[in-house]
């Protein structure tokens, strides 16, 4: 089975908790950075991570990483990513979110637009078509720039994983399920003990 490099974003400060969760599932850690943990896994790992990781916000398949300081460079290097390996001829694809920190390229809308154009050009040449119906499955792409290093991932989660839960009603200032799970994991609480939340409302 094919092995992917997977990116699991999380709340800042919870990287160690998420790393421990990933190791408990039996996967090899590639890198721990501010706000995300990268690890290796196959297609089954993608499914298991989306279901069982309680502190991850979403799971991305890493499509590529490169340095870009100009929009021309961003276009050309995005075009070099083998998009045909991930997105079929009828796939619906778009850059759903772009974030930039301490980078020369900082306009999210421009980053999204240029990357989409590069993806289209790559897939047009690979599939020998001039128009995409985009009638198939969705392949949302997320991009993050940190100090001019561009990391590109295909989102396998869709809606953020903190919305997986059973919550039927929401109060005015709810704590997300992923953050609540992390807070519990940071305590010495065990499953056989009673848990009381005095601030539950």
Predicted regions mapped to residue ranges:
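Non-catalytic nucleic-acid substrate-recognition regions in nucleic-acid-modifying enzymes
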Residues: 2-139
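Glycine-rich, histidine-containing beta strand-loop boundary motifs that form or position
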Residues: 34, 154-156, 199
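Glycine-rich helix-loop-beta junction characteristic of Rossmann-like nucleotide cofactor-binding loops
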Residues: 83-87, 174, 184-192
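A residue-level signal for conserved active-site and pocket-lining positions in enzyme catalytic cores
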Residues: 95, 143, 183
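Hydrophobic, well-ordered secondary-structure segments
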Residues: 112, 116, 120, 140, ...
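C-terminal edge-of-domain segments
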Residues: 141-154
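SAM-dependent Rossmann-like transferase core, predominantly class I methyltransferases
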Residues: 152-186
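Conserved class I S-adenosyl-L-methionine
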Residues: 191-201
